[in-house]
Regions:
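Active-site-adjacent helix/loop segment of glycosyltransferases
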Residues: 7, 211-321
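Short, acidic, metal-binding catalytic loop of nucleotide-sugar glycosyltransferases
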Residues: 22-32
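A conserved acidic beta->alpha catalytic loop
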Residues: 23, 39-48, 64
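Glycine-rich, basic loop-to-helix element that forms the pyrophosphate-binding segment
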Residues: 62-80, 87-92, 97, 101
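Short, flexible, basic/aromatic active-site loop/helix in glycosyltransferases
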Residues: 137-170
Length: 334
């Protein structure tokens, strides 16, 4: 049996399948990995596209849209026997040889539980620009805001090889292209279905770190990500999920004392974000922020245990205040 399952979760993405699935099939070693498409209850012609245009691709069909988190949990549970699983977005283009560096690095480093490639924008020109969803590896700042090597807020760096020295320890790896040891994924509890989508990979990576495993970016590999394939930037639904899930992430993973203090700080920042959205006449985003805090208060009772170790304090790189750095000090790069 092949050691790797590359699982693409699809929801109403027939056009993305036509555009990107051929690159995955062409770029992925058939000796190393099976490519599996898990359809999350699509209502477009995704099933017809898969059956008629990609008849040899392994497929799983779900009866409804379970979201990114539960969709992957179900797919991984059904795709049994693989030592490694790659979570690959349906809007990712893979060049030839992308998977080998990830696999061989994990095989040579048993202390590593998950890895990611460098994530570049899928562009029409030859520029190598890091992509928002993961760039060259993710971190959390002192207030729990995610940022990346190569991307802080909306500022994206060109890849000039500045992060290529060696595979680096990171706090979180992108869910757009994440290779994880399957047994560790299950041990860590998989993706949290309550998140539905957005930031669930950060939560998973936090729990992987709590097991003592490392998460690294392997710069010898890169893939191209379109981004916004499910929910584009500026969509109030995306705003809602990002704000709500960021609060859930901190509440469920931080020790209780640190978590309470940090959530007070985040309420202040989110209040500022609410008024900024109003000032820009983005009423949908402003309402989404309010709903996010309302629903967080309803959902936080679902999480009653807190780890005894504060991982944010254990990783010095995460002590930055990127809000101050970015907006006041004008520090726009990692």
């Amino acid at each position: 049996m092949k050691p790797v399952a590359v699982i693409i979760l699809n929801w109403n993405g027939a056009n993305l399948l036509r555009r990107y699935l051929p690159t995955v099939l062409a770029g992925t070693s058939a000796d190393l990995a099976d490519v599996i498409v898990a359809d999350n209850g699509s209502t477009d012609d995704s099933r017809q596209v898969l059956e008629h245009e990609f008849p040899t691709v392994k497929t799983l069909y779900f009866d409804q849209n379970y979201g990114f988190a539960e969709g992957y949990n179900r797919a991984i549970a059904q795709a049994e026997g693989y030592r490694y699983t790659v979570l690959l977005n349906s809007d990712v283009r893979t060049p030839a040889g992308w998977i080998e560096p990830l696999y061989h690095y994990c095989e040579a480093h048993p202390e590593v539980g998950a890895v990611m490639p460098k994530l570049w924008q899928d562009r029409d020109d030859d520029r190598q620009v890091f992509e928002y969803a993961g760039a060259a590896g993710g971190f959390l700042d002192k207030h729990g805001y995610p940022y990346c090597r190569g991307r802080i807020f909306d500022t994206l760096e060109d890849d000039r090889g500045q992060y290529d020295a060696e595979p680096a320890d990171i706090f979180w790896a992108t869910g757009a292209c994440l290779m994880v040891r399957t047994a560790l994924y299950v041990q860590a509890g998989g993706l949290d279905k309550d998140f539905f989508a957005h930031m669930e990979e950060i939560d998973l990576c936090w729990r992987i770190l709590l097991t003592g495993s490392k998460i690294r970016v392997v710069p010898e590999s890169h893939v191209y990500h379109l981004g916004g394939g499910s929910l584009p930037q500026g969509n109030p639904r995306k705003t809602y999920l990002n704000f709500r899930n960021s609060l859930l992430l901190l509440h469920k993973n931080l020790p209780q004392r640190e978590g309470k203090w940090l959530l007070i700080v985040r309420r202040l920042y989110d209040t500022l974000a609410f008024f900024m959205a109003l000032a820009k006449l983005h009423g949908g985003d402003a309402k989404a922020i309010l709903r996010a805090h309302r629903d967080f208060r309803k959902m936080r009772g679902n999480y009653t245990s807190h780890p005894s170790q504060n991982l944010l304090k254990a990783i010095p790189e995460c002590r930055r205040n990127i809000v101050v750095d970015y907006y006041l000090r004008r520090r726009r790069t990692f």
